[in-house]
Amino acid sequence: EERDVLHISLSPFYFLSKGGHFVARSSRLESGFQDRLIESLKALFPGCMVFKMDQIQGLPDLLILYGEKWASLECKRSATAKKRPNQDYYVEKMNDMSFSRFVCPENKEEVLNELQQAFQP
């Protein structure tokens, strides 16, 4: 019997394999949060465009275009999730240009409130 999903437990990391690709559990958690965040952004900012950025090291995960304004968000699975090299640099630099934040489930509402203020005309 062929299986589509293979679960392997390597505490504290969990992996899911589907179609021969392994994805760390932490990445899946971040991805699920990111998908829900995109839904929230589209509901809060009708007509906005949300782009998942290339995986260039350090660039924020999402670019949001709304009217004449833009923002970037770096998604983290939790407030204590490790940052990768250059992430602080790019979030700070893009925040100086417009609006950029690290966002996680613990600060999502706060960041969305700040983004609403930033996107006001």
Residues of each region from the PLM?
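Catalytic phosphate/metal-binding cores of nucleic-acid and nucleotide-processing enzymes, i.e., regions
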Residues: 3-121
